[in-house]
């Protein structure tokens, strides 16, 4: 595969979902990525961007993008707006029940646009 074909294939694996400015620091928004609801979460301090599954396994609702963004002992997290369980934004692990986790996605910013990798990360990878 030549270099141009590799670049084209990689572009297909990433979905352009919105402008970085569409996600204010300290908030989340929902985006559709490869047919799945993904919560894009931007922390305020430090300014960082994360992508996790939007489905809250405790309330059985697609609400995590509307959660409370913050940190717990330095761990960036989002708390479900329903029952308040917190999820590590880096790993998807529930900070209140380590047996539960939500999918996480690679995310990057290019020319002011947020791109999300179409497949969730495998557990144990970054």
Regions found by a protein language model. Name each.
Residues 56, 80-83:
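Short cysteine clusters
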Residues 1-75, 88-89, 101-126:
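N-terminal pre-ligand scaffold of iron-sulfur
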């Amino acid at each position: 595969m030549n270099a141009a074909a590799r670049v084209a294939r990689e572009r297909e694996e990433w979905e352009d979902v919105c402008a970085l400015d569409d996600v204010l620091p300290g908030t989340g928004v929902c985006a559709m990525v490869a047919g799945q609801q993904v919560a894009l979460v931007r922390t305020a301090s430090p300014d960082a961007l994360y992508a996790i599954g939007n489905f809250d396994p405790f309330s059985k609702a697609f609400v995590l993008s509307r959660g409370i963004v913050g940190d717990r002992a330095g761990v960036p997290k989002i708390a479900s707006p329903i029952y308040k369980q917190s999820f590590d934004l880096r790993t998807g692990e529930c900070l209140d029940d380590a047996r539960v986790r939500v999918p996480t996605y690679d995310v990057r910013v290019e020319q002011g646009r947020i791109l999300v990798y179409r497949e969730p990360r495998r557990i144990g990878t970054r």
